[in-house]
Amino acid sequence: MDKAEYEGAINRLVAAAELVVSGASDEQRLDALAMLAFFRLRRARIAEHGVPHISSEDLFTGTATAALTLAGRKELLAASALLDQARMLVDA
């Protein structure tokens, strides 16, 4: 995966996480904020570390798009599940 494609996917994931945080209940807010922090940190580290290993690049980019789409439709639980899936695809 090239840097531009990764950046685009991370930006979609950050946007989806921001939407999930804004609509999360009090019980879900902490998990949503943790997910947002994870993707913001990944975005900030692109310059230093480059693109990390992604176990399935096509699944990662598709998941990013789907998460943003569902978050935009206020399907917050589904978007959260997709954010979690994307997180698992990124090797730490």
Language model regions located:
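Long, charged/polar, soluble alpha-helical segments
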Residues: 1-92
